[in-house]
Amino acid sequence: MAKDSTGRMRVTVKSAGRMKLSSKLWLERQLNDPYVAQAKRDGYRSRAAYKLLEIDDKHHFLKPGASVVDLGAAPGGWSQIAAKRVGATEGKGKVVAIDLLEMPEIVGVTFAQLDFLSPAAPEKLLAMIGGRVDVVMSDMAANTTGHRKTDQLRIVGLVEDAAAFACDVLKPGGTFVAKVFQSGADATLMTQLKRDFASVKHLKPQASRKDSSERYVLALGFRGPETTNWSNPPD
């Protein structure tokens, strides 16, 4: 162990066998991340839970009795927070977690293994939850190629797809929150969201790593399905 610049003890990993440098650095970061350790103590499936906690503590959209959809939910950290905040663990609100991957059961959460990009997905969700929802959230990140511009476009494209899905299933007044990455590629996304929501802003929770370009977009006050047209973006 060694001390970092703040005086805290830092774990270093000695390379074992054929461990790649990138794997070694990732493991060191995990071992020295206070949010990773706290998530284990609190029983959350990922450190991302604290990002949603912070965003909701400031903006209060996960209200008791609300209905919530978590896109790309695995491993389930955001779904855990949503279930507690809306009362789904006590049979009050509703939380539906959607992912292509299987996800272990979470108390108060209904899991749907499906592709939200499927044309039939919005109708399946509406039938499952019994009507339009209050919140759609996404902590998804697109698979990267290593080519910066291509990756930026992929990331923004995924958020646009999530936003289009949200506009298909949200109630008027509803909320959309999603992970983005700081770049110049999201100008059209922000314009579209501002057309469809009363308030749109970028956020960077303290739980986001300081060296990451990760941000979250929070769109409040959905204007209603009649305003949306994600197949025809505004100029």
Swiss-Prot record:
It catalyses: uridine(2552) in 23S rRNA + S-adenosyl-L-methionine = 2'-O-methyluridine(2552) in 23S rRNA + S-adenosyl-L-homocysteine + H(+). S-adenosyl-L-methionine binds at residues 76, 78, 99, 115, 139. Gene3D superfamilies: Vaccinia Virus protein VP39. Keywords: Cytoplasm, Methyltransferase, rRNA processing, S-adenosyl-L-methionine, Transferase. It is found in: Cytoplasm. Its EC number is 2.1.1.166. The active site is at 179 (proton acceptor). GO terms for molecular function: rRNA (uridine-2'-O-)-methyltransferase activity. Pfam families: FtsJ (PF01728). GO terms for cellular component: cytoplasm. Disulfide bonds: none annotated. Its main location: cytoplasm. Specifically methylates the uridine in position 2552 of 23S rRNA at the 2'-O position of the ribose in the fully assembled 50S ribosomal subunit. Belongs to the class I-like SAM-binding methyltransferase superfamily. RNA methyltransferase RlmE family. This is Ribosomal RNA large subunit methyltransferase E. It comes from Rhodopseudomonas palustris (strain BisA53).
